[in-house]
Design a protein with these regions (language model features):
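An acidic-aromatic
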Residues: 46-106, 173-176
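Gly/Pro-enriched, hydrophobic low-complexity segments
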Residues: 30-32, 63-64, 122-194
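N-terminal leader/targeting segments and the immediate start of mature chains
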Residues: 1-54, 123-129, 190-194
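A short, amphipathic edge element
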Residues: 7-8, 111-127, 177
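Short, solvent-exposed coil/turn segments at beta-strand boundaries
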Residues: 19-22, 47-56, 72-79, 134, ...
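Extracytoplasmic/secreted envelope proteins and their assembly/folding machinery
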Residues: 7-10, 14, 108-111, 152
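Short, solvent-exposed helix-to-loop capping segments enriched in aromatics
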Residues: 17, 103-118
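Short hydrophobic/aromatic-rich beta-strand segments that constitute the beta-sheet cores
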Residues: 25-27, 54-59, 78-84, 141, ...
């Protein structure tokens, strides 16, 4: 299989996102602390997503209070985000800063952000790379006129799911997501009950 051009890879990823009905993935997330300039401790999340808008996220590792919490959004039942951890239950408005990033975790959101940054960007040729035990395509590009100065996107070669996404600026890495597991389960609306 021939290595795609940067434009072809972005187009193939967009097609993958459009045709993927349901998925589950786990990722490790770190972002730079602006006070120290260092990457934060690793956070781990699992997302289950069913088109067009059902989502459930489990906080695997973040802090003692949040670990094990599950956030669910099912707009057929309610416009709010429901969180539970054991017997504790909370309800958040969709625009509450506490849960704002919850809506930035699905492939559709990630694709839109990557497309925005890719428009007019200077891209390096796509490379074949290893990410852990998986074969991937790595696309590195420099967005024009944006605080993000460099994006490194690695997609799994066989099914084009993300393996790694790194955003950097003049100070270095701003945020890093490493996707450790993914699957395509047969999810239904019933999997997103509140």
């Amino acid at each position: 299989m021939q290595t795609p051009t940067p434009q072809q890879l972005m187009q193939q990823f967009a097609q993958k996102v459009a045709r993927t009905r349901a998925y589950r993935y786990t990722w490790e997330f770190q972002e730079r602390d602006e006070k120290t300039g260092k990457l934060s401790a690793k956070q781990i999340y699992t997302l289950e997503f069913l088109q067009p808008h059902y989502r459930k996220m489990t906080i695997v590792q973040r802090d003692a209070f949040s670990n094990g919490a599950v956030l669910i959004h099912n707009p057929d039942l309610d416009t709010k985000v429901h969180a539970r951890k054991g017997f504790i239950r909370r309800v958040y408005e969709r625009n509450d800063p506490e849960v704002a990033r919850f809506f930035e975790t699905d492939l559709g959101y990630i694709l839109k952000e990557l497309q925005r940054l890719f428009r007019g960007a200077k891209a390096e040729p796509v490379k074949s790379v290893q990410q852990g035990q998986r074969n991937g395509y790595q696309l590195v590009f420099a967005p024009p006129k944006d605080p993000v100065q460099r994006v490194s996107l690695t997609l799994e070669r066989a099914d084009l799911m993300p393996l790694r996404i790194e955003y950097a600026d003049a100070k270095g890495t701003r945020s890093l997501r490493v996707y450790t597991e993914y699957a395509f389960p047969n999810l239904t609306k019933d999997d997103f009950t509140i």
